[in-house]
């Protein structure tokens, strides 16, 4: 793939002062720049220590020059790295010297973009570079590294290859009707289709776990008024983020707190108490609470363990059952264990539902059980060598592919329509291609790489 022949340069290390700072150059002028600044042509892939000089020969700094001729470099072009002292003034003088020699200032993410355009890495791998830099936990960093090494891309490529094989079979049968292949009676197409759907479902589930580790899990605290929801928010946040009183309906709007548990990002949402009310303001709060419940990754249903209705908490608010997307996303919190006499404990029922008895206000007893549970929900220390990082756009593409395959299967089994199945298979393949960049618009590429750091 052709890329612009301009030479680009940027400071590749973080802003501020440090022991070492790096100026990176990529493009056809990288070798000329190296020779002009160091006074000699560096031997490829060897570290050369010496002075860095300006146009008059005055020394700007001393450091190490590394030269990588293309295509054996990160970007696939000639690349020069000048590693000097990490002061911002020194680095800026060195960068200005590179620009003076014909380079232009790189856009954010342009080095990674050129690596993608030169087939040095695919789009998912390029995004993994940014994810690795921005990782907020060791687990997220490990997942990002696996994506950078191609684990996620390989899973997508395997799915794509199976789709291509299926498309070849289906479209050949359509193009050569004299063969009289009956898709349903044959059974081969349906078997292949179900195999791809099952594998795609597994990848989607694993990608969802990777996205939680990267972006953070949205945890909604829901329940009746005065169940202790705001107290639980404050306990998790470690500060008085929400007003707590004995008056029912104190919380009338959605409150959001961003917290970390052992480096794992969580977006905790406190909501208005769920009850019938004639108060217009509180009614709006209840509606917003139900909306937040529908969008949550995990729901903490808080009940007052001292209340009689605590024995059947899911019957407290029928609309809650209608609103929650998946019962498996709900964790029951029996609060006020210090008053009810409940033992501080985490229990898992036969059907997998988790109940935690704790006290949000009495020294936060049981809070550590909740923290460990939330970490487990995010996949903390539960990953394997096949785990990888993923982004929301990856999940959207995987869901689009899954929906297309589901629709195609319906077309095949209900109408025997091979032509319509072929179109659904094409759309599924295109959706998967958007993940790795096999099918990507210029606008999409621009949005992705512009979110990177300058110098990456």
Curated annotation (Swiss-Prot):
InterPro entries: G_TrmE, GTP-bd, GTP-bd_TrmE_N, GTPase_MnmE, MnmE_dom2, MnmE_helical, P-loop_NTPase, Small_GTP-bd. It is found in: Cytoplasm. One of its GO terms (cellular component) is cytosol. GTP binds at residues 226-231, 245-251, 270-273, 335-338, 359-361. Binds 1 potassium ion per subunit. Mg(2+) binds at residues 230, 251. Keywords: Cytoplasm, GTP-binding, Hydrolase, Magnesium, Metal-binding, Nucleotide-binding, Potassium, tRNA processing. The keyword Acyltransferase does not apply. This is tRNA modification GTPase MnmE. It comes from Pseudomonas syringae pv. tomato (strain ATCC BAA-871 / DC3000). The gene is mnmE.
């Amino acid at each position: 793939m052709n890329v612009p022949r301009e030479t680009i340069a940027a400071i590749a290390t973080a802003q501020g002062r440090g022991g070492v700072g790096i100026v990176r150059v990529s493009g056809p002028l990288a070798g000329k720049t190296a020779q002009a600044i160091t006074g000699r042509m560096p031997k490829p892939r060897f570290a050369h220590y010496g002075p860095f000089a300006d146009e008059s020969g005055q020394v700007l700094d001393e450091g190490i020059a590394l030269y990588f001729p293309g295509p054996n470099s990160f970007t696939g072009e000639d690349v020069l790295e000048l590693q000097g002292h990490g002061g911002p003034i020194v680095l800026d003088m060195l960068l200005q010297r590179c620009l003076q020699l014909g380079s232009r200032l790189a856009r954010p993410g342009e080095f990674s973009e050129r690596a993608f355009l030169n087939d040095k890495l695919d789009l998912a791998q390029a995004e993994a570079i940014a994810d690795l830099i921005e990782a907020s936990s060791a687990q997220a960093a490990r997942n990002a590294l696996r994506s950078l090494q191609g684990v996620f891309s390989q899973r997508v490529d395997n799915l794509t290859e199976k789709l291509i094989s299926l498309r070849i079979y289906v479209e050949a049968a359509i193009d050569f009707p004299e063969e009289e292949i009956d898709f349903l009676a044959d059974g081969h197409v349906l078997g292949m289709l179900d195999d791809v759907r099952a594998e795609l479902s597994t990848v989607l589930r694993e990608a969802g776990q990777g996205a939680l580790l990267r972006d953070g899990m949205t945890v909604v605290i829901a329940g009746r008024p005065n169940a202790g929801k705001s107290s639980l928010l404050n306990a998790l946040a470690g500060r008085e983020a929400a007003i707590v009183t004995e008056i029912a309906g104190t919380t009338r709007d959605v409150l959001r707190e961003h917290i970390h548990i052992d480096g794992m990002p969580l977006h905790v949402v406190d909501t208005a108490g769920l009850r019938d009310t004639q108060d217009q303001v509180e009614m709006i709060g209840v509606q917003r609470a139900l909306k937040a419940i529908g969008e949550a990754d995990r729901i903490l249903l808080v009940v007052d363990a001292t209340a009689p209705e605590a024995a059947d908490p899911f019957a407290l608010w029928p609309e809650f059952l209608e609103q929650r997307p998946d019962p498996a996303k709900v964790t029951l919190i029996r609060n006020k264990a210090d008053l009810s006499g409940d033992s501080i404990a985490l229990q898992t029922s036969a059907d997998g539902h988790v109940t935690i008895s704790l006290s949000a206000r009495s020294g936060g007893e049981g809070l550590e059980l909740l923290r460990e549970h939330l970490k487990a929900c995010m996949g903390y220390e539960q990953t394997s060598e096949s785990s990888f990082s993923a982004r929301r756009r990856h999940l959207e593409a995987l869901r689009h592919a899954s929906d297309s395959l589901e629709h195609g299967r319906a077309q095949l089994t209900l109408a025997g329509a091979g032509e319509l199945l072929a179109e659904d298979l094409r759309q599924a393949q295109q959706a998967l291609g958007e993940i790795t960049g096999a099918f990507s618009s210029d606008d999409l590429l621009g949005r992705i790489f512009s979110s990177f750091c300058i110098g990456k």
